[in-house]
Amino acid sequence: QHYALLGIAAYYECTRDTLASRWLMEGYAHLENYFWDSRLLLEGYYDETNYDGSNPRNKSFNATVDAITTHLLYLYLMTEDPQYLQRLEELAHEIEVRLLGSMPYQAIGFVEKFNSNWGWNNNESLTIMGHVLKTGWCMGRIYQLTPQPDYLAAAESLVTHVWNRGYDQEYGGPYKDYNRLSGELLLWGLPDTTKAWWQMEQAITA
């Protein structure tokens, strides 16, 4: 659902169009009302709901990190409203606790899929180096807004992890997909190692 706001947020940033502003704020309100889990110690965005907004469930990398890059960061930069900074800090905390917190127990990367209570979904073992890099970029960007040393340390740790464990030191560029439990590079039937353009972009921004 976060990506539904990406284009609207970018358009509003460029034009300050009042209709785009209304769409953006209505979309943000929908996410806050139906997707945000406010339970103590379990805070975070749910991954999905039913079409009518009922039965919110599961959490994930996407539900957490993509909220930052699709709209929250830009809402704060455009308005300097402290409510958006507070949400960014809450998401930074979840990144530190849930994503980075899982890394010592993986062969590579971090857990990307969780149940509603942040329990690991070990039926999904995929970890993507572009996601690790994107998370590092987000932590660095939030550090620029509120310079807490642990945010910078987290950003450096994530980027260094990819450099040391998931980067092609011979030809350059981050590899793409791994099994986080075994550390196996996933080739998906291809005869050679897999990379992707968007992961190169994430590496540059990180």
List each model region and its residues.
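Glycan-recognition and catalytic cores of secretory/periplasmic carbohydrate-active enzymes
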Residues: 1-206
